[in-house]
């Protein structure tokens, strides 16, 4: 699903092909990332437990964020609140409004499920 389609930025659901791209890009910029993180997000998305969003910038995967409508974790886990977690923009795409747009869309998605959102 596409949540936002602007001039250079598209926000859409995480796809299987994104997992390898994000893992490789994060490792290239010095982050110690394993593909299992994205495989878990894809599994949770398929189970209906989360909405995992990806930002594309000019057609390239540039960032991600995850919404758990009824999070099980954290201080408010199990209380029916939406949680926004695991938010990142690849270094080479920063300072272009991608992170702001990802957070805006994640908040819009989260508030469909709960009046209270935590990060």
Model-flagged regions — what are they?
Residues 71-78:
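A short, polar/charged loop-to-alpha-helix boundary motif
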Residues 6-22:
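A short beta-loop-alpha structural element at the N-terminal edge
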Residues 54, 60-69, 83, 88:
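Conserved beta-strand in the GNAT
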Residues 89, 95-108:
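Conserved acetyl-CoA-binding loop-helix of GNAT-fold acetyltransferases
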Residues 50, 79, 84:
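Short coil/loop residues immediately preceding or within conserved phosphate-binding loops
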Residues 19-27, 38:
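Hydrophobic alpha-helical core bundles mediating ligand binding, dimerization, or RNAP-core interactions
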Residues 31-54, 64:
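Active-site rim helix/loop that mediates acceptor-substrate recognition in acyltransferases
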Residues 110-119:
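Conserved GNAT acetyl-CoA-binding A-motif
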């Amino acid at each position: 699903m596409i949540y936002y389609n602007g001039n250079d930025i598209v926000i859409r659901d995480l796809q299987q092909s994104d997992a390898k791209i994000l893992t490789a890009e994060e490792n290239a910029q010095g982050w110690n990332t394993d593909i299992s993180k994205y495989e878990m997000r894809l599994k949770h998305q398929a189970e209906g437990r989360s909405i995992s969003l990806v930002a594309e910038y000019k057609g390239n995967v540039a960032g991600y964020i995850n919404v758990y409508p009824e999070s099980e974790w954290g201080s408010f886990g199990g209380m029916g609140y939406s949680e926004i977690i695991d938010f990142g923009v690849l270094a080479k795409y920063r300072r272009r409004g991608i992170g702001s747009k990802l957070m805006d869309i994640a908040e819009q998605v989260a508030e469909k499920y709960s009046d209270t959102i935590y990060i």
